[in-house]
């Protein structure tokens, strides 16, 4: 299994219930063929540059280990989710 780091930014006005639903959805995708090692919610932060006329976003960092198919499925779901304004999945070299 490979180790990955996922960072995603949600719209800052997303309520806590919706944030938790999305986190559980993404966690479920990962745990289907992997394991979540750490979830770190950074909260609302100023964006480095304006995205879709927004200056703030809710940052979440997830470290996980999985097969190579999971990041592809996760990427597909992150692109579909309306509340996600940006995301990035990188493989961590050991």
UniProtKB/Swiss-Prot annotation:
TM region(s), chain numbering: none
GO biological process per UniProt: translation
One Gene Ontology cellular component: ribonucleoprotein complex
SUPFAM superfamilies, alphabetized: Ribosomal protein S6 (SSF54995)
Pfam families: Ribosomal_S6 (PF01250)
GO molecular function annotation: small ribosomal subunit rRNA binding; structural constituent of ribosome
CDD domains: bS6
Keyword tags: Ribonucleoprotein, Ribosomal protein, RNA-binding, rRNA-binding
InterPro entries: Ribosomal_bS6, Ribosomal_bS6_sf, Ribosomal_S6_plastid/chlpt, Transl_elong_EF1B/ribsomal_bS6
Function: Binds together with bS18 to 16S ribosomal RNA.
Similarity-based family: Belongs to the bacterial ribosomal protein bS6 family.
HAMAP family: Ribosomal_bS6 (MF_00360)
Protein name: Small ribosomal subunit protein bS6
Species this chain originates from: Alkaliphilus metalliredigens (strain QYMF)
